[in-house]
A protein has these predicted regions:
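Active-site anion-handling motifs in enzyme catalytic cores
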Residues: 1-167
Length: 167
């Protein structure tokens, strides 16, 4: 999905998060056109300590950046998966049903906002909630990720057995 219509609002929301966290912000592009979105966000927020990870990172490098973060403001499903696997608390801006379904499986729906309701004020309130519940979220994410990881491995084994039967 192209988020160019939301860029100015995203920038305002990122500034709100930056004011709360008082930490450098790193934008991790997970699809090719996200890099240009990151550049536009940086242009809109020249006063922020906002960095853009290289656009050609592999999945492992992206996961390592997220793993070493204290908080994720996430939109893309893969960034949410990386944060969940590493126990990094996050607030999700929901743009697609697949993201909603992932949050349900993680029991993290309360830490999300539908894209059409995203405002700096709403983001501030949700970030406060995530920060207040940080320890519980870390415990929850680690537990849910372990369960979902086992389900993924079982599914993989089923697919591999079906493929090997047809060969």
């Amino acid at each position: 999905m192209d988020f160019s219509k939301e860029t100015e609002n995203f920038a305002k929301c990122i500034v709100a998060v930056a004011e709360q966290l008082k930490q450098p912000l790193v934008f991790v592009p997970t699809v090719m056109h996200d890099y240009s979105l990151g550049e536009e966000l940086k242009r809109l927020m020249p006063e922020q300590n906002f960095r853009i990870a290289p656009g050609d990172l592999n999945c492992k490098a992206m996961a390592e950046i997220i793993e070493n973060s204290s908080f994720l403001l996430g939109v893309r499903m893969h960034s949410i998966i990386c944060a969940a696997r590493q126990g990094v608390p996050f607030l999700t801006l929901i743009y697609d049903e697949k993201v909603s379904q992932l949050l349900k499986r993680l029991d993290m729906e309360q830490y999300s906002l539908p894209l059409e309701t995203v405002t700096p004020e709403a983001v501030r309130g949700c970030v406060d909630e995530v920060l207040n519940d940080q320890e519980e979220i870390i415990t929850l994410l680690r537990a849910r990720s372990a369960v979902l990881g086992k389900k993924v491995l079982r599914s993989r084994d089923i697919v591999l057995s079906l493929v090997s039967e047809t060969v």
